[in-house]
Amino acid sequence: MLPIPEELTTLISDLELYLADGLKGENLSKKAKEKREAFIKRIKEVKLSFPQDFKDKYAEDSEEEEDWDSNEGGSLQSERTDKDEEACEGAQQAPAVAAQDLTSVFKAGYLEKRRKDHSFFGTEWQKRWCALSGQTFYYYGSEKDKQQKGEFNIEGYRVKMNSSLRKDSKKDFCFEISATDKRSYMFCASSVKEAEEWVKQIDFVLKDMTGIIPEEEEEGQELYDDVGQMDEIYEVLPEEDMPSPPPKVEPVSKHPPPTPAVDKSTDYANYYQGLWDCMGDLPDELSFKRGDAIYILSREYQTFGWWVGEKNGQIGIVPKDYLMELYAL
């Protein structure tokens, strides 16, 4: 007997996957459910009739069938797909870490991740909870997962917006993390602004790794150049037109009036709480844990992403992106 073409066995397996997995969460009528079960049963009978052609695929489907009986939407199957993709790329698997245990998180939230390979009936984009922790990009099924579905180190990568990844209304929400001779990762955010924030944070970490001067210092350099231009203007002016310097005023030897005290018990707008654990690297940085209440004393370093906060009598600078408002006003 001639073997069944591989294209046909793949199509039958994909059809079974769609009937058993893709339609599992749909609100089907009683008649449609009966038809669905009948088709699944018939496909299994066909596979049993040609064991030499469906040997490997049938073994995989048997394992997946057990997962479908106890999981919604075949989440274990998608997790296996993610791990298989990582293994195929030769990526080094990091130890399992729960989403809530990540530290030094620069950016986190839900994204749609594009699968490297997907079947005819499979989903090309999968919803994932993603987090940039230090130099590692993690992705989970949800923010409550105890183990990541995959991760990769962003060293050597570059990030950019890419509207060619999709053809629908979300095409402008997409960005790509790629590198030469490495696997590319494609994601879709909920909006253009959210995608741009992801690109900005990832690019910031990449620049920090390569020692490129941050934007704030570049702006300072531009300000220095402006001062040089002002000097040139003053040199052109005639000397007689130069205004005379103001008379020197001797400082008054008395203390300035005290700043009115703020009642912290009612100053709810300046109370924040930690989103994640944060351990200070320097003596002037304030350490805190997720859920700790922090009172903000000053926002004068906001341009650099830092505030001055107080916790249990200790004062130090805190990263503002690690905080959220404690009270809803």
From Swiss-Prot:
Organism: Takifugu rubripes (Japanese pufferfish)
Subcellular location: Cytoplasm
GO CC terms: cytoplasm; plasma membrane
Compositionally biased intervals (Pro residues): 243-260
Official protein name in the record: Src kinase-associated phosphoprotein 2
Keywords, comma-separated and alphabetical: B-cell activation, Cytoplasm, Phosphoprotein, SH3 domain
Domain PH, residue spans: 104-207
Name of the gene: skap2
GO biological process terms held by the UniProt record: B cell activation
Residues of the SH3 domain: 267-328
